[in-house]
């Protein structure tokens, strides 16, 4: 098994840690997610990731740094993956689309890489993501196995593109996409713009409720108790 091969830590300790992290990080209890968390443990078992952004970063780093069977080229790393796939996830979210074709992914990402003088081999990139079940087949098309991967890569893209960030914060309204907020704030901790947006939007929603109920914001329902 995985731990026998890589000797992460004592068996029961690994199982306990795996169970705790799956619960704490709100990740689906599936075999592939267990494997991906175990991959993240390879980075440093004693270093508990504080959020899912860090877990996914560890997973991608190990996947693309692996010189074995999962590796398909020497021009791809975790940062290139985030840069390229983040752009494609932007396209998906702008079109409210979850599924896509292999040819569309390759054409769009190849054009993007050429435009930015990026040498990433997008065929290899897609194959690696498919082999690690981050992207899977679905009714003749492709999709991300779990939607949180789209939001993770989209959050990376928001860090690179002010235009896309504005789209997600304004037109798309990320207030209703908590995973976008989670990943955006978890990537590097710099999220003053998101906090400002949340405060503004929550105040606006509160004012709408007060107006419809014809009550003031300082009402205390426990006053007469």
Residue ranges and their predicted role:
Residues 160-225:
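Hydrophobic repeat-domain scaffold segments
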Residues 1-161, 170-175:
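Extended hydrophobic
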């Amino acid at each position: 098994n995985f731990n026998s091969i890589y000797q992460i830590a004592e068996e029961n300790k690994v199982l306990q840690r795996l169970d705790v992290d799956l619960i704490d990080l709100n990740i689906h209890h599936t075999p592939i997610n267990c494997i991906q968390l175990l991959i993240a443990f390879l980075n440093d078992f004693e270093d508990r990731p504080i959020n899912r952004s860090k877990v996914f970063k560890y997973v991608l780093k190990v996947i693309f740094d692996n010189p074995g069977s999962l590796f398909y080229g020497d021009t791809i790393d975790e940062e290139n993956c985030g840069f390229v796939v983040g752009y494609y996830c932007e396209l998906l979210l702008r079109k409210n689309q979850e599924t896509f074709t292999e040819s569309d992914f390759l054409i769009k990402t190849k054009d993007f890489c050429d435009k930015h003088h990026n040498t990433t081999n997008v065929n290899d990139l897609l194959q690696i993501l498919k082999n690690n079940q981050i992207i899977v087949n679905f009714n003749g098309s492709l999709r991300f196995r779990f939607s949180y991967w789209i939001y993770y890569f989209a959050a990376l893209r928001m860090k690179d593109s002010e235009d896309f960030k504005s789209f997600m914060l304004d037109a798309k309204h990320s207030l209703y996409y908590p995973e976008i907020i989670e990943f955006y704030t978890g990537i590097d901790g710099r999220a003053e713009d998101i906090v400002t947006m949340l405060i503004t939007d929550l105040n606006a929603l509160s004012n709408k409720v007060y107006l419809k109920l014809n009550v003031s914001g300082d009402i205390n329902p426990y006053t007469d108790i």
